[in-house]
Amino acid sequence: MTVLISPSTLAESIHAGKKQTVLAAFWAPIEGAGRTVFCSEHIPTSIFCDPALELSGVPSSEDGRNPLPPLNVLARSFRTWGLNTDREIVFYDQGRGLFAARAWWILRWAGMPNVRILDGGFQKWEDHELGHAGGPGNFPHFCNVRPNPGQLSVATIEDVKAHQGILIDSRDEQRFAGRSEKLDLKAGHIPGAININAKSLLEDDFTFKSPEEIRQIFADKGVTSGENVIVYSGSGNHSSQLLAGMEHAGLTGASHYFAGWSQWSANPENPIEA
């Protein structure tokens, strides 16, 4: 199953009436504002997804800033979205791709195999002038599936401490180097980690680079496979995007330290490099 779907291919499948569920993961810093943006304009046939409420658990120093959602929350979201085993799922966001990638990874982890990311998001859809709709969005279909977690590898903090392979920090270079940190308690990175900024896998329009280009980016850092690799970010967003890029490039098998730097840096006993 390919990770990405282009705006033109999605438009063709919508017009052809293909069985699929299109979900808009629209986030906004003010509660409820994401739904307001969605209701003003979205891709036809879309259903709204609230990343803060449906793709995250309760933040804590023990679990991280945006931990994985509890299974009861995810099961409720599956029903709200009307997920079905015979329907492909397509996620998109406003354009940067972080929340669509987060959704893609969480649903794959929860046992949904046919999940794709709209390459370039809603902004790329608009650039192609493919049309949009307003209002509350599509009515969900009957849901016939429940979350089945564990289908992708999750690394715990203990796994990271014991890891002898490659550890990748997917945040930007300033945060990795400890020169800037606006989101978490401390600046820096986990000792031994290398830095591959998730944004480096994207073109200027936030579409993914070609598989060949992405493989070269990883090869330049000594990474030629996803095996024995753990990826992290602050709280699961950039790391999900990096993992999507790795799968797009055929570098499969990496584990996801989802709690990431927000969990690691909250414990004063954990070592830090900067």
What are these regions (language model features)?
Residues 1-274:
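Cytosolic catalytic domains that perform sulfur/thiol-centered chemistry
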